[in-house]
């Protein structure tokens, strides 16, 4: 849309009772978004929407390319996300193996080894309750995505 990921701002339509519960939860779990994010969100809602379609199409193309290509790499897989800017790469088949001298117990081990030896940063999903998954962002160019996938193939082959 307006590329405001990470700003932690949004809105919801709910009945009064649910809205009250949501408000109570938010007031105890997080502070209000900064004033700049609030103003930007208003402008994104009332501003031109043609760029939203353009950006959505670009993200879909990168997502589809990443998913299709990753699912051809032996040892890893991913599902096609419906509303994110990243995929969750399943590395369950790599758990218990040694890659570049590193015994892979979970996503943390994989992410550390891949960063050190493949020079690609991924986010381990251990903290999200998914110890056999790492996140790959597709909020970048197709060229960068392909370079990352090329490095993954090389990393897994050596």
What is the meaning of each model-derived region?
Residues 1-158:
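PLP-dependent class I/II
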